Amino acid sequence: MLMIITGKSASGKDTIKKELVKKDYEPVLSLTTRQPREGEKYGLDYIYTVNEYFESLLEQDKLYESRKAGNIYYGTLKSDLDIIKHNPEKNYIMIKDLEGAEDIIDYVGQKNVFVAYIDVSDDIRKKRASIRNDFSEEKW
């Protein structure tokens, strides 16, 4: 079973994911070209890479889904989704936007996926984003 956590920025997705990983959920990491935030680690939160490498994965058709937000790429490796597809008895967890979640459901199969949308007030999200130095009025 794959649990996909989705929600707006600073809604608490990473906190929930980290707690479930402690309870034997296997994390499925997205690739991203953004810089790590304070406290984030390669291989624990994301697979951090550069645009050139990400674009080469796209050209080689190794990514199942990808998004670009500004100059930052996010994506999921087909090989990771194949592992989930062939091991439905294991518990996996990942964070995606709604569009990415829909793409992954199409690939893995709806019966193998549970999507949880985390809804938090904008005031709380702004406070959290300010704490992690990731708040600007333009983004909100």
Go through the PLM ranges and name each one.
Residues 5:
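Hydrophobic anchor at the beta1->P-loop junction of P-loop NTPases
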Residues 13-14:
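Walker A/P-loop
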Residues 17-18:
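The feature captures the helix immediately C-terminal to the Walker
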Residues 22-30:
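Post-Walker A helix-loop "phosphate-sensing" segment adjacent to the P-loop in P-loop NTPases
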Residues 33-92, 98-99:
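ATP-dependent small-molecule kinase phosphotransfer cores
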Residues 91-97, 109-130:
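Conserved phosphate-donor/acceptor-positioning beta-strand/loop module used by diverse small-molecule
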